[in-house]
Regions:
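Short amphipathic alpha-helix that is part of the acyltransferase structural core
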Residues: 1-35, 135, 148
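Conserved active-site alpha-helix within GNAT-family acetyltransferase domains
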Residues: 95, 107-143
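A conserved beta-strand-loop-helix scaffold within acyl/acetyltransferase catalytic domains
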Residues: 38-83
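Conserved acetyl-CoA pyrophosphate-binding loop and the N-cap/start of the following alpha-helix
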Residues: 88-97
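Short loop segments at secondary-structure junctions
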Residues: 55-58, 87-88, 141-144
Length: 148
């Protein structure tokens, strides 16, 4: 657990307020808008996730941000679902969250660490991310389906 000025970051899923995270992703995010709850839950189970809290997780904390990393634990990691609730922005909390993710001991060996962003390039550049070569990455985008 990491603590700073009344805020905390935890990777313990027992601390996460899944309702807050899901509502933000489902209702507010541009990248996961409309994600079904069961797929959201499945994604948490298979990721290294970081919850950002005001207060002490497990006691009096409120979930105010989140990020998760999808990784094979050896060569590749993908940072995704990063957010800080609007009323907590402008306090350096997103920077601290990303700093914590990048410094996590389980994420030090991956050669490739990627992400996608529409509007936070400056934040991620502080930690070494650079735009990918044009045309290098490809993807398939499908509509959400229920998990089986």
């Amino acid at each position: 657990m990491w603590r700073r000025d009344g805020f905390a970051i935890s990777t313990d899923p027992a601390h996460f307020d899944r309702d807050v995270i899901w509502r933000y992703l489902h209702d507010e995010s541009y990248w996961a808008n409309g994600i079904p709850r069961d797929l959201f839950e499945r994604s948490l189970e298979r990721s290294l996730s970081f919850g950002l809290f005001e207060g002490e997780p497990g006691r009096d904390a409120s979930q105010i941000g989140f990020s998760r990393v999808v990784t094979d634990g050896a060569t590749f990691a993908w940072l995704c679902d990063v957010f800080v609730l609007p009323e907590y922005r402008g306090r350096g909390l997103a920077t601290w969250l990303i700093e914590t993710v990048v410094g996590h001991p389980d994420l030090q060996v991956q050669r490739g660490f990627v992400l996608a962003t529409r509007d936070a390039h400056g934040l991620y550049a502080k930690f070494g991310w650079k735009p990918a070569e044009a045309g290098r990455f490809m993807r398939i985008t499908r509509p959400y389906r229920m998990a089986e």
